[in-house]
Amino acid sequence: MGSLGEEPQVAEDCMGLLQLLSNGTVLRSESIDLITQQIPFKNNQTVLFKDSIYHKPNNLHLRLYKPISASNRTALPVVVFFHGGGFCFGSRSWPHFHNFCLTLASSLNALVVSPDYRLAPEHRLPAAFEDAEAVLTWLWDQAVSDGVNHWFEDGTDVDFDRVFVVGDSSGGNIAHQLAVRFGSGSIELTPVRVRGYVLMGPFFGGEERTNSENGPSEALLSLDLLDKFWRLSLPNGATRDHHMANPFGPTSPTLESISLEPMLVIVGGSELLRDRAKEYAYKLKKMGGKRVDYIEFENKEHGFYSNYPSSEAAEQVLRIIGDFMNNLS
């Protein structure tokens, strides 16, 4: 402990964009906005979007996307998209997340719900998971109160019996947490029914390094950065084997007896997180009674589908997600 009057020291520095000081103060740089602004917002004339608040106590907002071509006679499935950012960064308004949601809505002919959630280290885990539950509670409230008719003036019909959760990176971890909480029966939201989960480059961790983690850094991601995200987001004193980071850690609750809805795991073959995602899918499959599809895109890095939305691989990802949804409807 420093003496009185001693200036606080930088305990963690995350790319110069986020600093955690020794006295607990968190400093965030506005430069992150400058970085995200380098990605142009997509001008998609086929999708309407609007913002709404879903949790007033924490002032948390979400963004709704609806394809203009949607017919009032056709009920739209719901896709709840959780953005990535290592639990420390990210927002529904970041261009690549916004653009991806526009594409999800138009390609899947679905109503897309893209929420913000509390970020670490100001709000360490399980804050993000609690907010994810709040999103589904909000969705339930819309279903039972017919509030969906107020989302858009034309009163688009929404099928709450066909809800899908899609998560990117840390959002993929959130999707896993929701799948487990639903599967264990701790969340009951009838008439809202989650039919399946899509985990895209899910952010999982562990103390023992995998081969892909020991491989070369990616253009936008390094092992050091992943470790910092865990130190900043996990409860103080927790290791990467904590169950919120490692679903199969030495002290993690078993998933053997939990009934999980079908899951689709998508990962790039050159991702540092590839082996974590592959192990996750393999171990769930091995338990039996759990449907898990694993798709790996050769030579692709983390976030290839949102960072390069016009690529053939990104278009293929959308087709795979669409097929996954259609097979479960």
Swiss-Prot record:
Q: What happens when the gene is disrupted?
A: Normal shoot branching. Reduced hydrolysis of strigolactones (SLs).
Q: Which Gene3D superfamilies match?
A: alpha/beta hydrolase
Q: GO CC terms on record?
A: cytosol; nucleus
Q: What induces it?
A: Up-regulated in root explants but down-regulated in shoot explants on callus-inducing medium (CIM) incubation.
What does changing residue 169 to A do?
A: Abolishes the hydrolysis of the synthetic pro-fluorescent probe Yoshimulactone Green (YLG), commonly used for the measurement of SL hydrolysis
Q: What is the reported tissue distribution?
A: Expressed in axillary buds, leaves, stems, hypocotyls, flowers, siliques, and vasculatures of shoots and roots.
Q: Which InterPro entries match?
A: AB_hydrolase_3, AB_hydrolase_fold, Carboxylest/Gibb_receptor
Alphabetized GO MF terms: carboxylesterase activity
A single Gene Ontology biological process assigned to it is:
regulation of secondary shoot formation
Q: Where is the active site?
A: 169, 271, 302
What does it catalyze? (-)-2'-epi-GR24 + H2O = (-)-2'-epi-GR24 ABC-rings + 5-hydroxy-3-methylfuran-2(5H)-one; 5-deoxystrigol + H2O = 5-deoxystrigol ABC-rings + 5-hydroxy-3-methylfuran-2(5H)-one; orobanchol + H2O = orobanchol ABC-rings + 5-hydroxy-3-methylfuran-2(5H)-one
Keyword annotations of the record: Cytoplasm, Hydrolase, Nucleus, Serine esterase
Q: Does the keyword Metal-binding apply?
A: no
Q: What positions carry the motif Involved in the stabilization of the negatively charged intermediate by the formation of the oxyanion hole? A: 83-85
SUPFAM superfamilies named in the record:
alpha/beta-Hydrolases
Q: What is its EC number?
A: 3.1.1.-
Superkingdom: Eukaryota
Location in the cell reads: Nucleus; Cytoplasm, Cytosol
What does the entry list as the binding residues for (-)-2'-epi-GR24? Answer: 85-86, 169-170
Q: Which family does it belong to?
A: Belongs to the 'GDXG' lipolytic enzyme family.
What does the record give as the function of this protein? Answer: Binds to strigolactones (SLs) such as (-)-2'-epi-GR24(4DO), 5-deoxystrigol (5DS) and orobanchol, and catalyzes their hydrolysis; SL are phytohormones controlling shoot branching and communications between plants and microorganisms. Promotes shoot branching by dampening SL-inhibited axillary bud outgrowth.
Q: What is this protein called?
A: Strigolactones hydrolase CXE15
Organism of this sequence: Arabidopsis thaliana (Mouse-ear cress)
- Name of the encoding gene: CXE15
